[in-house]
């Protein structure tokens, strides 16, 4: 699916290529604003990020971008530079609501949700309140109060204890999905955490939990991620048990140290080796030939000839 966006530069609409499910394409046909791109807060960084709302089914999707250098798209009769591939994946809106609940918790009181989810920078956050089943979702991360005799409003307050239990379930669900899809995570955990080879092989279940924790941490604040790590009783990565130097993975920008002496393949060393090697019978016969009057092949590639070549 290619979507046109006017960049306002007079060049025309810039097109973006999206990989979406068929039912999302149908939503754009049923309603004029069936699919809506909005800028909302990233619950991990607090910065802005692009999300996709399915207004027909009231669903929220995060927009991811896959990019490589020197790629372009051929769209109908045009060429779109950049070669970016956008794809939309469902995201639990509770992750975004957590950002506002944690922020409102500093006031230390119960509040109605429409007073909690308020953002002058990202005003479209009110769309989160229109998502179905919101009250059931909030039950996982908040304490609730309400008096039906006075009004039908409910008041919410962030609960860290409930949130950690909910996040633990998310981690367990992620672990199950990783195993079902036969995703090998031990090498990834080992390379990022500097675990020894023996430790990574014996703690396979822990590797899955640690990797799942890392995935979930992309949707929650850093402080909450640290609390979740403690709640899951994940040990701190051990830097005191490195692998042998020949197997150690370097995570710096510096090149990995060579395991062999590659200098033996240098041109200078090869010439020296040729001089020291014994001459064959043919080479000895060639050495006895009278070379007077002959020009060395190097003369054809001397300084003068190089200048001529440079002028061409």
From Swiss-Prot:
The keyword Phosphoprotein applies. The keyword Nucleus applies. The modification N-acetylalanine is found at residue 2. It is found in: Nucleus. It holds the Pfam family RNase_H2-Ydr279. Keywords: Acetylation, Aicardi-Goutieres syndrome, Disease variant, Nucleus, Phosphoprotein. The modification Phosphoserine is found at residue 296. The modification N6-acetyllysine is found at residue 295. Widely expressed. CDD domains: RNase_H2-B (cd09270). Residues 236-256 are annotated as: Disordered. GO terms for cellular component: nucleoplasm; ribonuclease H2 complex. Non catalytic subunit of RNase H2, an endonuclease that specifically degrades the RNA of RNA:DNA hybrids. Participates in DNA replication, possibly by mediating the removal of lagging-strand Okazaki fragment RNA primers during DNA replication. Mediates the excision of single ribonucleotides from DNA:RNA duplexes. Belongs to the RNase H2 subunit B family. It is linked to Aicardi-Goutieres syndrome 2: A form of Aicardi-Goutieres syndrome, a genetically heterogeneous disease characterized by cerebral atrophy, leukoencephalopathy, intracranial calcifications, chronic cerebrospinal fluid (CSF) lymphocytosis, increased CSF alpha-interferon, and negative serologic investigations for common prenatal infection. Clinical features as thrombocytopenia, hepatosplenomegaly and elevated hepatic transaminases along with intermittent fever may erroneously suggest an infective process. The RNase H2 complex is a heterotrimer composed of the catalytic subunit RNASEH2A and the non-catalytic subunits RNASEH2B and RNASEH2C. This is Ribonuclease H2 subunit B. The lineage of its organism: Eukaryota, Metazoa, Chordata, Craniata, Vertebrata. The gene is RNASEH2B.
């Amino acid at each position: 699916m290619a979507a046109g966006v006017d960049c306002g530069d007079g060049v025309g609409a810039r097109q973006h290529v999206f990989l979406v499910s068929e039912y999302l394409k149908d939503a754009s046909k049923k309603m004029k604003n069936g699919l809506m791109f909005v800028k909302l807060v990233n619950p991990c960084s607090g910065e802005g990020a692009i999300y996709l709302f399915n207004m027909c089914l009231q669903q929220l999707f995060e927009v991811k971008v896959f990019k490589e250098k020197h790629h372009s798209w051929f769209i109908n009769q045009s060429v779109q530079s950049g070669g970016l591939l956008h794809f939309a994946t469902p995201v639990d809106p509770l992750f975004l609501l957590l950002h506002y609940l944690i922020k409102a918790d500093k006031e230390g009181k119960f509040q109605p949700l429409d007073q909690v989810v308020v953002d002058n920078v990202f005003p479209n956050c009110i769309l989160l309140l229109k998502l179905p089943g919101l009250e059931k979702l909030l039950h996982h991360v908040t304490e609730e109060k309400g008096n039906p005799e006075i009004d039908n409003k409910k008041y919410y307050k962030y609960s860290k204890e409930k949130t950690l239990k909910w996040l633990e379930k998310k981690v367990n669900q992620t672990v199950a999905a990783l195993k079902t899809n036969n995703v090998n995570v031990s090498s990834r955990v080992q390379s990022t955490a500097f675990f020894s080879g023996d430790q990574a092989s014996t703690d396979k279940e822990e590797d899955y939990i640690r990797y799942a924790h890392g995935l979930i941490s992309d949707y929650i604040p850093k402080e909450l991620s640290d609390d979740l790590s403690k709640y899951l009783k994940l040990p701190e990565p051990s830097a005191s048990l490195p692998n042998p130097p020949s197997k150690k993975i370097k995570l710096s920008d510096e090149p990995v140290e060579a395991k062999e002496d590659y200098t033996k393949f240098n041109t200078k060393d090869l010439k020296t080796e040729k001089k020291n090697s014994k001459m064959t019978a043919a080479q000895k016969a060639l050495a006895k030939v009278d070379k007077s009057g002959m020009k060395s092949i190097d003369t054809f590639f001397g300084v003068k000839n190089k200048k001529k070549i440079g002028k061409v």
